Amino acid sequence: MSNAAVPFVSGIRNLVSVYDAFIVDLWGVIYEEQHLCYGVFNALSQLYDEGKPVIFLSNSPLRSSDVAKNLERMGVKPRLYKGVLTAGEIIYHELKAGIDPFFSNLGRKCFHLGPECFWQPYAQLGYVCVPNIDEADFIFVTGTFGTQDSLDKYEPFFKVCLSRRLPMICACPDPFILQNGALHIAAGALAAQYQKIGGNVFWRGKPDPSVYEYCLEGLDVSDRRRVAGIGE
């Protein structure tokens, strides 16, 4: 392990000569709770002026186009970045393609765990949301039942799912979310717990190296060492 001190970087201006492209997290870097973080517009404008492409990478269960619309509503214009990639976008295309062996016997009926709005982008793929876990072929997780949840609350639910050997798809790997200044468990924590007790879970998103490969392909850089990741 290296004992070298981590250098302090005071601003984007000190990075533009070192890196050719940037993969940037959204929550906590670009915005928090639908408000842009301080200095974001100036930083993105500087990268744009210097010809440094930016791809935003998020574990949101929403599709990339929906996140791009949210960014524009907050004042981040599409010209300032090259693209957006979300965990939800990757899951959407995995479900649509059905190439991964995980999907070979998935079935068409899912029990959705999370806010209803997060399921809407996937409804067009022909899967049916069922209200009862006994009818489901698999579990689709985008969130929790509520912000005051704890993992203990889900133990009976997990036991039923495991007894039926239901596979789980997690479209938001983040274990926690920050709301009103407090941390709450999120979809990723539920998926990790289900996997821990023996459940079969499929997920994509940070910090899985494959999602960075998608971003690098989109950036089309000749030297990957000159791509900076900002955020978690």
What is the predicted function of each stretch?
Residues 1-232:
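HAD-like aspartate-dependent phosphatase fold
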